């Protein structure tokens, strides 16, 4: 129903909830100015939320791309060999993780070996070549170990 839809939006400004409930209870529409105010508040919160999502996603991508580049340069310079690198997928298991990333948690791969999900392959959290469904708002990490022997 209309009430559930209006009050079910997480980004709404809750200061308008009482007026929505009253208007529904009394069977009358909200004044246009109030609707405009609610839409403005929702839009502002949505824009802020999207900026945060994009910022977190891109920051994660930059961190992991930089780390991958660091290891690539170390291999290229001969400081380490590719077969010495072991990467383990670490998922924050707090109930908000993707099902596909929960499955990846703890899996190990060597250098250059991608992880596989039902949506495709992913080299690391935030991988720009992976499907968006696997990277947007990802909070995973890679634990990389260099085997000395």
Show the residue positions of the predicted features.
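Activation/maturation switch segments at domain boundaries
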Residues: 36-149
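Structured, charged N-terminal subsegments at the starts of enzyme catalytic cores
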Residues: 1-43
């Amino acid at each position: 129903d209309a009430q559930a839809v209006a009050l079910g939006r997480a980004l709404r400004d809750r200061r308008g909830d009482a007026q929505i409930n009253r208007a529904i209870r009394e069977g009358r529409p909200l004044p246009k100015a109030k609707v405009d105010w609610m839409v403005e508040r929702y839009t502002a919160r949505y824009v802020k939320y999207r900026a945060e999502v994009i910022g977190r996603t891109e920051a994660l991508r930059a961190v992991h791309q930089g780390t991958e580049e660091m290891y690539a340069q170390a291999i290229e310079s001969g400081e380490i060999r590719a077969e010495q690198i072991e990467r383990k997928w670490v998922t924050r298991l707090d109930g908000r993780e993707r099902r596909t990333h929960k499955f990846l948690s703890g899996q190990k791969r060597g250098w250059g070996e991608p992880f596989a999900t039902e949506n495709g392959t992913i080299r690391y959290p935030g991988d720009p070549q992976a499907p968006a469904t696997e990277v947007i708002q990802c909070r995973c990490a890679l634990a990389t170990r260099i085997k000395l022997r």
